[in-house]
Swiss-Prot record:
Residues at which Ca(2+) 1 binds: 161
UniProt similarity note: Belongs to the peptidase A6 family.
Gene behind the chain: alpha
Species of provenance: Black beetle virus
Disulphide linkage map: 69-318
Active site annotation, chain numbering: 75
Gene Ontology molecular-function annotations: aspartic-type endopeptidase activity; metal ion binding
UniProt-listed Enzyme Commission number(s): 3.4.23.44
Protein's name according to its UniProt entry: Capsid protein alpha
Keywords: Aspartyl protease, Calcium, Capsid protein, Disulfide bond, Hydrolase, Metal-binding, Protease, T=3 icosahedral capsid protein, Virion
Amino acid sequence: MVRNNNRRRQRTQRIVTTTTQTAPVPQQNVPKQPRRRRNRARRNRRQGRAMNMGALTRLSQPGLAFLKCAFAPPDFNTDPGKGIPDRFEGKVVTRKDVLNQSINFTANRDTFILIAPTPGVAYWVADVPAGTFPISTTTFNAVNFPGFNSMFGNAAASRSDQVSSFRYASMNVGIYPTSNLMQFAGSITVWKCPVKLSNVQFPVATTPATSALVHTLVGLDGVLAVGPDNFSESFIKGVFSQSVCNEPDFEFSDILEGIQTLPPANVTVATSGQPFNLAAGAEAVSGIVGWGNMDTIVIRVSAPTGAVNSAILKTWACLEYRPNPNAMLYQFGHDSPPCDEVALQEYRTVARSLPVAVIAAQNASMWERVKSIIKSSLAMASNVPGPIGIAASGLSGLSALFEGFGF
């Protein structure tokens, strides 16, 4: 029997599908459009660099040195700079006075320290019973900066032989405790008050009685109470504070002669209206040579019974003097720096941003805080159209180079 081993071939069926879609047309070699590059950001960066470089030629280095002198501590910078870059044009002598001194605070007493805008005088000090304020019998005594006599002479009648007027850029003070941690006690309180020098016609206690135009201080009542804006902390933490010019302009004040006390001799405290006395001591050592346009810093250190409180008191001030033509200092003078509106605006911005005082440990980072305020302010100002924005952008570029300039 023959088997049929032939397999049937299975025929493959083709399935044809009909569609209405058109077949894709082969693309021709069409050149592609170039990719758009984001030139706007790059253009802005180029413009920013151009503005910064352009501002480098217009903004003066004295403007930056002015900010550094006003706000940097003396252990960081002792350069007095070229002066205040405002619209004043004339010959000036710049000076940065610095005093470091050890001080002991009497137990069961409150010690008051006044950092006042008095050229050549570092601070005024007096102590009163604990828990009280100065009264009419209290006398604040002067402690001088080094070099007082070289600037203002040894006689009260020759204070203006070298310089005729002055103005402040800033005043600073720091108290750095050195007490044993097991022996200290007490607190530090800081506030500020505006004190001004005034000329008033007063009766003079002479025989026969007469009257005279004498100098007196107004605003000292602010020392007799802690202001609403104040700083209070434990003594061991210390304090750092500074005062700047709050007036619209940096105006010069005259150098005064023949004044050793306020109120003057033969004028009583009750007659003058002052709540207490200020005495500079012997005229060969010190004197009251003027009063600038700065808020006075008031520091009260309270030391209870049994406390052993000691500290290093450091105070410094940046001033600008107008030298007399026939004085030796005239040869060391220089022209006042050109006006730098942006630097002056940043001075005001920093002044508004700083607190009344901080603990002493934060003084080391104070210049870093000032730089951050300047950079933040200039970043906002650089968006302003016109020359102000251009100048701000340029100074912002300079502020980024502070480290390179030693700032």
